[in-house]
Each structure stands twice: as C-alpha cells, then as structure tokens.
C-alpha cells in the first residue's frame, strides 16, 4: 500500500491497564537493533521525543518486498479518560503528521 506514516493517538497503558500492544522494538532497544514480527524485520533507526509526541523511524523488511522506511508519530498527551482540554497540541500534532508524510506515499495508517 506504500504506507509511509503510522499515527498512534493512544498510550500503551490506560489507568495501568494494557490498552495497546507495542508493535515496534522497545524503548530500551538501541537504535539500529532489529526485532522480528512474523515475516517482518523491524529496525528502529531513530527516536525523537518532544513535549507531547514521539517520532520513531523504522526500516521494515521481509523476504518478498523491498525494504521500506516508515515513520510513526505517537501522540503521548491524550488523557486516560476523555479528550484533551486544549486542542492546540492536537492540531499541531496533526500538522506534523501531514508534514511527515512523503508526497506520493500511500494512506496514513491511524
């Protein structure tokens, strides 16, 4: 599908309960380390932490397709319950998502 951008707007835990499974190499993984998920090899190549979101860059590879670079933008300021009180950060995050998605790439996965 030529997806180049994944957006995540939930945290892994909500009220200390698992809400989302981590589908990328862990934060304790050193950049450049690779983990296998089914047929896919995922290498974490870059992590940038900002006030209210994290940008992770991965190389995805399997034996049947060319390697691809995928960027994940993870909004980390969503409250456990309800919605953000101030939309400013969320709107800024949306702008960052749009800017991060390369031209002529496939759909953004949310």
Swiss-Prot record:
Residues 1-110 form the Tyrosine-protein phosphatase domain. Its EC number is 3.1.3.48. It catalyses: O-phospho-L-tyrosyl-[protein] + H2O = L-tyrosyl-[protein] + phosphate. It comes from the Eukaryota. It is an enzyme of class 3 (hydrolase). PROSITE patterns: TYR_PHOSPHATASE_PTP. STY 3 and STY 6 may represent a double domain transmembrane protein tyrosine phosphatase. Belongs to the protein-tyrosine phosphatase family. This is Tyrosine-protein phosphatase 3. The lineage of its organism: Eukaryota, Metazoa, Chordata, Tunicata, Ascidiacea.
């Amino acid at each position: 599908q030529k997806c180049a951008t994944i957006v995540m707007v939930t945290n892994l835990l909500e009220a200390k309960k698992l809400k989302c499974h981590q589908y990328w190499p862990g934060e304790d993984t050193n950049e450049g380390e690779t983990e296998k998920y089914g047929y896919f090899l995922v290498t974490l190549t870059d992590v940038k932490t900002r006030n209210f979101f994290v940008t992770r860059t991965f190389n995805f590879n399997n034996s049947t397709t060319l390697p691809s670079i995928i960027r994940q933008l993870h909004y980390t300021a969503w409250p456990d319950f309800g919605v953000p009180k101030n939309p400013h950060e969320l709107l800024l995050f949306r702008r960052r998502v749009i800017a991060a998605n390369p031209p002529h790439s496939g759909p953004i996965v949310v």
